[in-house]
């Protein structure tokens, strides 16, 4: 699958907020958005008034960039969200949050979702004891994510385990055993991603 290979800092500047696409660098003075918090391009410093459609489109682009999902896959997620009982926008965010690469990132295995995605692709993780190297794999309640025995001995994963993150209520982790369990589906209040999902629903409802 094709991936965006350009300067990711431009994406943050385009959206007008930090998307934390470069991990630890985003928290330092080296962050391009900290130094130039306006849109890229010649007219970047003079932001024009955006139409309702433009706001809806920007919100969709923001969600795609945060979770590292391309257009075709994002549209599939939305169609799945519509078929699930409940509010479509919240269902969409739940599906994105339950991606294996996102859960790996939430657990602290990677300073960014991009790094976590690479770790998944390289086969470092198991789901219910079986290797899963598909970043988009949707985790289900009661499934257990663990680090492979081989990877546990590496300095990278030892460092990750020694610096655990504060986890949302729907994930329980045992860093001593390099394991985590999905104990519930994420509620909207558990999702701290700066996305206005109602705008995305409005866009796809046209």
UniProtKB/Swiss-Prot annotation:
The keyword Cell division does not apply. InterPro entries: Ribosomal_uS4, Ribosomal_uS4_bac-type, Ribosomal_uS4_N, S4_RNA-bd, S4_RNA-bd_sf. GO terms for cellular component: small ribosomal subunit. SMART domains: Ribosomal_S4, S4. Residues 98-164 form the S4 RNA-binding domain. PROSITE patterns: S4. Transmembrane segments: none annotated. One of its GO terms (molecular function) is structural constituent of ribosome. It holds the Pfam family S4. CDD domains: S4. Keywords: Ribonucleoprotein, Ribosomal protein, RNA-binding, rRNA-binding. The keyword Zinc does not apply. GO terms for biological process: ribosomal small subunit biogenesis; translation. PANTHER family: 30S 40S RIBOSOMAL PROTEIN, SMALL RIBOSOMAL SUBUNIT PROTEIN US4M. NCBIfam families: PRK05327.1, rpsD_bact. One of the primary rRNA binding proteins, it binds directly to 16S rRNA where it nucleates assembly of the body of the 30S subunit. With S5 and S12 plays an important role in translational accuracy. Belongs to the universal ribosomal protein uS4 family. Part of the 30S ribosomal subunit. Contacts protein S5. The interaction surface between S4 and S5 is involved in control of translational fidelity. This is Small ribosomal subunit protein uS4A. The lineage of its organism: Bacteria, Bacillati, Bacillota, Clostridia, Eubacteriales.
């Amino acid at each position: 699958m094709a991936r965006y290979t350009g300067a990711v800092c431009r994406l943050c500047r385009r959206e007008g907020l930090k998307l934390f696409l470069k991990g630890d660098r985003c928290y330092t003075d080296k962050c391009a958005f900290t130094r130039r918090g306006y849109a890229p391009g010649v007219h970047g410093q003079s932001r024009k008034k955006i139409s309702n459609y433009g706001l809806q489109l920007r919100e969709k682009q923001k969600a795609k960039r945060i979770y590292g999902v391309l257009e075709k896959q994002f549209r599939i997620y939305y169609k799945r969200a519509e078929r699930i009982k409940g509010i479509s926008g919240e269902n969409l965010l739940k599906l994105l949050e339950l991606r294996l690469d996102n859960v790996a990132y939430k657990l602290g295995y990677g300073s960014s979702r991009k790094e976590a995605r690479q770790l998944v692709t390289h086969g470092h993780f198991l789901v219910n004891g079986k290797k899963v190297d598909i970043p988009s794999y949707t985790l289900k309640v009661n499934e257990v994510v663990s680090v492979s025995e081989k990877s546990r001995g590496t300095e990278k994963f030892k460092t990750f385990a020694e610096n655990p993150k504060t986890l949302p209520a729907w994930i329980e982790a045992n860093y001593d055993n390099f394991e985590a369990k999905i104990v519930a589906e994420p509620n909207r209040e558990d999702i701290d991603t700066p996305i206005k999902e109602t705008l995305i629903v409005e866009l796809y409802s046209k």
